[in-house]
């Protein structure tokens, strides 16, 4: 294989690795946003679990418009378990469901971080090879 062709292939591989790293970084940011959303939900559910009376709350109607609502039964929650299926759960069960979701997100974050480190390591190795080759010339 010619030296020039080898260099071109390494540059192409490097570009692919950089795109892959960017995609992994975007996905990690999305997971972080999702985790923060679940943590806020968990905090709210734990509040509902701690009260015994009805509570007044603000409900977001969208477009920056909110309505005052009375939550009369704060011990039962509707939980989206996936594929558009919503089931009624006790607040404690809803808390466990959200905790499990957070755990899965954290596991995915760990896997993605590991993958990102591998991709960045490969990219760095190729960059070093290209730099060493350029110094020889």
From Swiss-Prot:
GO CC terms, sorted: cytoplasm; prefoldin complex
Keyword Cytoplasm: yes
UniProt keyword Signal present: no
Subcellular location: Cytoplasm
InterPro entries linked: PFD_alpha_archaea, Prefoldin, Prefoldin_subunit_alpha
Any one GO BP annotation for this protein: protein folding
Record-level Gene Ontology MF annotations: unfolded protein binding
SUPFAM superfamilies: Prefoldin
UniProt keywords, alphabetically: Chaperone, Cytoplasm
Family: Belongs to the prefoldin subunit alpha family.
Quaternary assembly: Heterohexamer of two alpha and four beta subunits.
Function: Molecular chaperone capable of stabilizing a range of proteins. Seems to fulfill an ATP-independent, HSP70-like function in archaeal de novo protein folding.
Name of the protein in question: Prefoldin subunit alpha
Biological source species: Archaeoglobus fulgidus (strain ATCC 49558 / DSM 4304 / JCM 9628 / NBRC 100126 / VC-16)
Chain's gene name: pfdA
């Amino acid at each position: 294989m010619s030296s020039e062709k080898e260099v071109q292939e390494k540059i192409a591989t490097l570009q692919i690795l950089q795109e892959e790293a960017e995609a992994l970084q975007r996905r990690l940011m999305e997971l972080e946003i999702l985790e923060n959303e679940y943590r806020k939900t968990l905090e709210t559910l734990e509040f509902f679990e701690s009260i015994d009376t009805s509570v007044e709350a603000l409900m977001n109607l969208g477009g920056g418009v909110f309505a005052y609502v009375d939550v009369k039964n704060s011990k039962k929650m509707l939980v989206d378990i996936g594929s558009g299926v919503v089931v009624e759960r006790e607040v404690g069960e809803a808390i466990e469901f959200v905790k499990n979701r957070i755990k899965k997100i954290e596991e995915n974050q760990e896997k993605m971080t590991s993958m990102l480190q591998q991709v960045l390591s490969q990219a760095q190795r190729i960059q070093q090879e290209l730099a060493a080759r350029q110094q020889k010339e």
